[in-house]
């Protein structure tokens, strides 16, 4: 590496969080590095806050006549000077830090010799924006789903333009953080040390391999793979986890399949942890597409060996993957109201039911009976359970897979009866359930036998877990569904 290349690496290089495989995991830094990193963190935090409240700041600035060229120039000069000072201090600090110079040299060599990148950098945990790419997703034809919208352009051009601009600002300033709190810069900063320590444990204790994937959108996906193929029959099955709206693979649902000795591939959604981008529907499906391609083309798993295990809003990328990879082994899964609906349908449209009905393979839904997040009515426990959104998913699956059976109000009522039943009542409802679900003579079934068959199908597609939204899944419920 030439002196010029080294200097450029020190200026643009990523922050190193920690050593992974050393007894002392703390990566050394000097006072100049600490002060400069603090300056950059403060400025980035100010930028994030200002972005969130930008509509109000602009309104205040306009009312006080602050939106003029002189003030813009002063703000630009201050920002540029601030960043130049911070980056210069950081660069000087890195010049006097032999450990960072060693890391910069390792990173430079890793980019020159891509096939050795993982082995060269495996000892460091650092910002992944500068990491070599382990896998690039291919651009292939995919299915995309969109909920039908009732919002169209109106004759009032001014109203439409105002609505679109206002909704865009709300969606990408604070609505995104409400839908996906895991993408909030503040939350990522607060739990950063916890994520770093858990990544180290996955590598050291579980033998995990970290992978950096490039999506067709140009985002980087931070992934972690634990290979158990040499450790028993379950290891030949790869469980791809899809976390919730505040979940990370470092702290999420990976432990459940790992405890049962499955191979596991975890990944972070766009904007979560070290994954780049924003958690919009388009970028999210591009990320899960890259993850599945990585599992097939790089890790060597067949599509039939892959199981998708999703939690909460992770059902959106999970159902998209199921719809686009049909051979996977299994899927587990007022005044402002018009504006809110328009924002969600336009910027955060996640048609989980539509995507799930496009998948015809084996699956099981796990309904959390005490769930406080995915309900639409507060009230008694019976009222909350009746509005659990898992109920709607079950009905969508039944209508799509068994249209001759679920085709009227009586059939839907039979499903509702089963959904509201206690475990003992369900035993009674399904005691005469046929061992083989022969669907050929539905028209000739009596109403009683038809209801028995519906209850039997419900018991195959959905199981209850007596827990709230954030309780880890009980190991006894993590079973690979089979076709029937």
Model-derived segments and spans:
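The feature captures the conserved acid-bearing segment of alpha/beta-hydrolase catalytic domains
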Residues: 332-438, 442, 450
């Amino acid at each position: 590496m030439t002196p010029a290349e080294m200097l450029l690496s020190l200026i643009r290089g990523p922050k190193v969080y920690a050593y992974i495989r050393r007894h002392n995991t703390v990566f050394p830094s000097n006072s100049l590095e600490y002060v400069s990193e603090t300056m950059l963190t403060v400025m980035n935090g100010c930028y994030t806050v200002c972005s969130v409240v930008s509509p109000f700041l602009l309104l205040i600035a306009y009312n006080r006549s602050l939106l003029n060229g002189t003030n813009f120039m002063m703000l630009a000069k201050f920002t540029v000077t601030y960043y130049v000072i911070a980056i210069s201090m950081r660069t000087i600090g890195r010049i006097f830090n032999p450990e960072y110079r060693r890391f910069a040299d390792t990173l430079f060599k890793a980019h020159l010799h891509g096939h050795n990148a993982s082995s060269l950098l495996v000892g460091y945990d650092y910002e992944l924006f500068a990491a070599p790419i382990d896998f690039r997703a291919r651009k292939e034809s995919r299915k995309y789903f969109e909920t039908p919208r009732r919002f169209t352009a109106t004759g009032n051009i001014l109203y439409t333009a105002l609505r679109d601009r206002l909704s865009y600002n709300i969606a990408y300033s604070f609505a995104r953080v409400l839908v996906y709190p895991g993408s909030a810069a503040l939350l990522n900063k607060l739990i950063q040390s916890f994520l770093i320590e858990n990544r180290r444990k996955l590598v050291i204790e579980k033998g995990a391999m970290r992978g950096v994937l490039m999506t067709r959108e140009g985002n980087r996906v931070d992934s972690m793979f634990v290979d158990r193929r040499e450790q028993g029959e379950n290891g030949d099955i790869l469980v791809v986890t899809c976390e919730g709206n505040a979940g990370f693979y470092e702290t999420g649902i990976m432990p459940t399949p790992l405890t049962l000795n499955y191979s596991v591939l975890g990944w972070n959604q766009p904007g979560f942890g070290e994954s780049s981008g924003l958690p919009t529907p388009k970028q999210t499906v591009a990320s899960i597409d890259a993850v599945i391609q990585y599992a097939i083309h790089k890790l060597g798993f067949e599509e039939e060996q892959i199981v998708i295990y999703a939690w909460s809003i992770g059902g959106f990328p999970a159902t998209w993957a199921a719809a686009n990879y049909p051979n996977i082994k299994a899927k587990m899964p007022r005044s402002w109201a018009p504006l809110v609906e328009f924002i969600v349908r336009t910027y955060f449209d996640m048609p989980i039911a539509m995507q799930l009905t496009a998948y015809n393979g084996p699956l099981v839904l796990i309904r959390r009976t005490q769930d406080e997040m995915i309900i639409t009515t507060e009230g008694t426990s019976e009222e909350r359970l009746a509005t659990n959104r898992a109920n709607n998913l079950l009905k969508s699956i039944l209508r799509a897979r068994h249209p001759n059976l679920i085709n009227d109000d009586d059939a839907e009522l039979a499903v509702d009866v089963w959904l509201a039943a206690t475990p003992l009542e369900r035993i009674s409802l399904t005691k005469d359930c046929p061992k083989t679900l022969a669907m050929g003579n539905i028209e000739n079934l009596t109403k009683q036998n038809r209801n028995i068959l519906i209850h039997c199908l419900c018991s195959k597609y959905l199981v209850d877990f007596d827990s709230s939204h954030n309780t880890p899944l009980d190991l006894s419920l993590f079973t690979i569904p089979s076709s029937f």
